[in-house]
Each structure stands twice: as C-alpha cells, then as structure tokens.
Design a protein with these regions (language model features):
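Long helical/loop segments within the catalytic core of UDP-sugar-dependent glycosyltransferases
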Residues: 110-112, 124, 140-228, 273, ...
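Short beta-strand-to-loop acidic/aromatic patch adjacent to the donor-nucleotide binding site
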Residues: 124-137
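Juxtamembrane C-terminal module of membrane proteins
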Residues: 2-45, 288-298, 324-419
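Short, acidic, metal-binding catalytic loop of nucleotide-sugar glycosyltransferases
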Residues: 67-76
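A conserved acidic beta->alpha catalytic loop
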Residues: 68, 82-90, 105, 136-137
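Acidic helix N-cap motif at the loop->helix transition within catalytic regions
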Residues: 60-64, 87-95, 141
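Conserved donor nucleotide-binding strand/loop of the catalytic core
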Residues: 90-119, 161
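Catalytic donor-sugar/metal-binding loop of nucleotide-sugar-dependent glycosyltransferases
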Residues: 229, 239-257
Length: 419
C-alpha cells in the first residue's frame, strides 16, 4: 500500500518485501515498522530506545552498523536515514527489514537526524534515541549500560565510550599509524578528562560524541538540533543540554562502541578540520553564559590555545636550529640568521628541543603499548609528533574561520573499509 502526501513518498510495511518506493518530493521512505514505544520507566529494562543511523554514501560500512544494531534491538526500532546517497546505502538498509528514510537533497547529518525524528515521531514513541554513525559498531553491553544510566532521571544524555577499531590487516602503514594515534588519544581523554567532566557533581562535559550516544526524548524535544551555520552537530547538541539546563551528561565504560578512523592523511585532515571548526562555531553560536560549564570550558580553551602555540613554536624553533646546524655556511649567510641562531641555541640547543618535543610524547605511547598489549605502537609512535602538530595547527587555524565562514552541514564520506 502507498500513501502520498506533500514532500513524502511512503511505502508502508516493514522489511525488504515492501512496495517499491516512490519519489514525491524531498523525502523518500522505504520501509516503516511499528511506532510503538513505552512511556518513561523507572527500571532500566523499561526504557525504550530507538536507533538512528544517519548515512551519506556509506554502502561500504552500513551493513556492519545495522548488523551490530540488530544484535541488540528489534528491527522495527532501527531507523536508517540516507541523506541523498548516490550509492546503494538505502537499498542495503531496506533489505534488512529495518525502517529507512531517504532524503532526496543533502541536508547534512543534523538535518537528517531532525528529519527522521520528525517523520517517525521518535521522541513521542520512545524514551530515548541512540544516534549511531554508519561506521560504528556497538559493544554487546552497550544497551544495558545506556539504559542503566538513563534510569537516573537527571541524565539527559549518555555519552558513548569510544574505542578505535583495530583492524591492521585492512590498513596501510599510514592508516595503522592514524588508528594507533587515535586509540591513544581517546584513552587519555576519556580516562584523564571526560570521566571527571561527567561526574555528577561537575557535569561540565562539552562533547557528547555523535558516533554512538543516547539522548533522552524529553531533552531532544527542547533542543535545536539543526540551527544552521554549523559544520557538525554533536558539539551544538551538547551545548544545548547545558545551556537549556536539560539535565546532566553521563558517561561510563559500559557504553563502548567501536569507531572507524580515517584511512588516509587527507581524510584525517578533513575530519579534524570539521571537528575543530564545529567546536569553535558552536562557541560562536552559544556565546558565554554564567555557569560552571563555561568556567571549565574556558580553562580547556586556554589549554588548547596555549599548548598548540607552544607546540608549533617549539617545532619552528627546532626547524630553525636544525637548518643552522646542518645547513652550513649557506644558511648562516642569510640576513640575521647567525645572530638569531646564536640567541636561540644559547637557551635551547637542538638536543633540548628534540627531547622536549619527542620524549614525553613517546613515553605516553610506550605506556599505551603496554596497556593495549600492542607492541606495534612502539613503531607507529615514532611518527605521532607530526600528527600532534597538525592537530595544533588546525585548532588555531579554525578559530578565525568560525567567525568568518558559514557552513551548511553537508557531508562527504571518507575512504571506508567494507564492514
């Protein structure tokens, strides 16, 4: 059976055996399941969750995310929204019998999330909504952990605990290096920073990562998910929770999910650029308001700016001294070079700069190799410093761009490995 209404082509009936979809405007819906959802319960087992998987040209990985979700949820509780995909993303999803909504114009991730929530009235039919990236797979204990945290009525959002997917056989040397670097970064950030930020007496976490996190429906109804002008959605959604005092952000290691990191330096550059630009754009949008959240955020911003400046300055000084040391008379003959070289090396010889930049960072890598039981990190860690410098450069470069550029949130998919 088919039903037409303005802007929507609807194929009723769950599963791959539904009618062929029709195009009636901006939205194409392929399969629709039951819209049943219980009221908010006190026991974790009573809490109903919907799963949203926004996707744009994700045919390489969408099957893995759906399979992971189907192992933990009924098929009628899973909703894929294909945001103007030019590949077979929507067809692959529809064959699994889950709900699929296909957007005919690229709205971006935030717009896709907003569209599927509205189309299926998810915040009216479920107690919470899990937003899952198409390249992410859930740990078997994820749902139980999320429900346990949502059982606390003060919790507005449950932050996923990110673990870098480690499949070295599918990656080049550069891809393995990026994955190892990200694994170290996520481990340190979550255990040394974010657990403290999400403690119930602090509640100052500035990011609920959009790769695999749950929002309470009552909080989602109050949020402006897609305000426009932002390149990504997850910083804004987290700021909305704090700015509108919708509740606290919770995080625990029992909500693990495995995320696929970029395979190339080009995709890494694009991803970090988007994340960093999105962070500064969100600060521009929400501005400052009196709160412990902003007090903690101010300290974090100060740390990011100062550390990035120091890292880049030390790297430039190291390059300057190295050229003077090994470049010979040709370099020293340049105007003012010898005077500058003498002044810098009087306080910072090349050995001190090299040790300061490399040794502390590599010690962290050695510890991570022991914790993870992955000796290969000792090799990849030799090349982490250039990635750290790239992160520092992008953190500073995106500050002025956040105030001078406007983004529409549209996305393009990076290189993926088939799930």
């Amino acid at each position: 059976a088919r039903e037409q209404r303005e802007g929507v082509g609807r194929a009723a009936g769950a599963g791959a055996g539904g009618d062929t979809p029709t195009r009636g405007g901006d939205v194409l819906e392929r399969a629709e399941g039951d819209d049943e959802g219980g009221a908010e319960g006190h026991a974790p087992s009573d809490i109903t969750l919907a799963v949203i998987i926004p996707a744009h040209n994700e045919e390489q990985v969408i099957a893995g995310a759906i399979s992971s979700s189907l192992s933990l949820f009924n098929h009628w509780d899973i909703y894929v929204v294909s945001d103007s995909s030019a590949d077979s993303t929507a067809e692959i999803a529809a064959k699994t019998g889950i709900n699929v909504l296909e957007l005919l114009t690229n709205r971006g991730k935030a717009g896709a999330i907003e569209a599927v929530i509205e189309e299926f009235s998810l915040t009216e039919n479920y107690d919470g909504v899990l937003i899952l990236d198409a390249d992410t797979e859930l740990h078997p204990g994820y749902v139980e952990g999320a429900r346990r945290q949502l059982a606390d009525p003060d919790v507005a959002a449950v932050s996923g605990f990110v673990v870098s997917e480690w499949k070295p056989d599918e990656r080049s040397f550069v891809g393995r290096m990026i994955s190892a670097y990200r694994d170290r970064l996520y481990f340190m950030l979550q255990y040394l920073l974010r657990f403290g930020q999400t403690w119930r007496r602090t509640n100052v976490s500035f990011i609920v990562p959009g790769f695999a996190s749950v929002y309470r429906s009552s909080a989602l109804r109050e949020m402006d998910i897609n305000p426009g002008g932002l390149v990504i959605e997850d910083f804004n959604m987290t700021f909305e929770v704090h700015h509108k005092r919708l509740g606290r952000v919770s995080m625990n290691a029992d909500t693990k999910a495995y995320s696929q990191d970029p395979f190339t330096l080009k995709d890494y550059y694009k991803q970090v650029s988007r994340w960093t630009l999105g962070f500064w754009q969100t600060i521009r949008r929400h501005r400052v308001w009196p709160s412990s959240f902003w007090a903690a955020l101010s300290l974090y911003i100060l740390e990011v700016v100062v550390v990035s400046l120091v890292l880049l300055l030390m790297a430039l000084l190291g390059l300057f001294v190295a050229l003077g040391t090994y470049g010979g008379d040709t370099v020293m003959a340049l105007p003012f070079y010898e005077e500058g070289f003498t002044a810098v090396t009087a306080f910072l010889p090349l050995s001190v700069i090299a040790i300061g930049l490399f040794v502390p960072d590599y010690i962290l890598t050695c510890l991570m190799a022991m914790i993870r039981g992955r000796p290969s990190y000792l090799l990849y860690g030799l090349f982490f410093l250039p990635i750290r410098l790239l992160d520092a450069f992008l953190a500073l470069r995106m500050i002025p761009r956040a105030w001078t550029t406007t983004s529409d949130g549209r996305w393009s998919s990076p290189v993926r490995a088939r799930s």
